[in-house]
Amino acid sequence: MNVYEGSLVGTGLKAALVVARFNSLVTEQLLVGAADALRRHGVADGDVDVFRCPGTFELPAVLRRVVATGRYDAVVALGAVIRGGTPHFEYVSAEVTKGVAHVAMEAGCAVAMGVLTCDSMEQALERAGVKAGNKGAEAAAAAVEQANVLRAIARAPARKAE
């Protein structure tokens, strides 16, 4: 049995962070966490590009364009959808999740989801690292690991049919 896993070593990886501007109090903290995690895992600052889009709903379209350039090993979507008094939250959350998943399935690189869907601003800030933990950092670490497992798959020897 052969086991292929991705490591958390980001040396030599090129990464992109796609960040929604709406709810910037939260998304800027996600960005700080993601950038810090990439740095801690060995991705050079010069190998990280940040792309900003107006809101979380727009993330999948920008994400798709960034992935299509073929310049990145890992791409992370960062945004925040906060529940209000209308069904808008459900629509946006569902469509963004589907959109990011669709891009991830078609991508030739690692794509990670760092989009918060929260019931309140307080909850969003907690998940963005104001109290503890940062979902942006977690998504960036997942992207590094995924990029490395995709590399391992590409290098895996072909098996003979029996």
UniProtKB/Swiss-Prot annotation:
Binding-site residues for 5-amino-6-(D-ribitylamino)uracil, renumbered to this chain: 22, 56-58, 80-82, 113
EC supergroup of this enzyme: transferase
One cellular component (GO) term of this entry: riboflavin synthase complex
EC number(s) reported in the record: 2.5.1.78
Pathway given in the UniProt record: Cofactor biosynthesis; riboflavin biosynthesis; riboflavin from 2-hydroxy-3-oxobutyl phosphate and 5-amino-6-(D-ribitylamino)uracil: step 1/2
Keywords: Riboflavin biosynthesis, Transferase
Alphabetized Pfam families for the sequence: DMRL_synthase (PF00885)
Reaction equation(s) it catalyzes: (2S)-2-hydroxy-3-oxobutyl phosphate + 5-amino-6-(D-ribitylamino)uracil = 6,7-dimethyl-8-(1-D-ribityl)lumazine + phosphate + 2 H2O + H(+)
A single MF term (Gene Ontology): 6,7-dimethyl-8-ribityllumazine synthase activity
Active-site residue numbers: 88
GO biological process entries: riboflavin biosynthetic process
Disulfide topology: none
Annotated (2S)-2-hydroxy-3-oxobutyl phosphate binding sites: 85-86, 127
Function: Catalyzes the formation of 6,7-dimethyl-8-ribityllumazine by condensation of 5-amino-6-(D-ribitylamino)uracil with 3,4-dihydroxy-2-butanone 4-phosphate. This is the penultimate step in the biosynthesis of riboflavin.
HAMAP family: Lumazine_synth
NCBIfam families in UniProt: lumazine-synth (TIGR00114), PRK00061.1-4 (NF000812)
Protein family: Belongs to the DMRL synthase family.
Protein name: 6,7-dimethyl-8-ribityllumazine synthase
Record organism: Anaeromyxobacter dehalogenans (strain 2CP-C)
Lineage: Bacteria, Pseudomonadati, Myxococcota, Myxococcia, Myxococcales
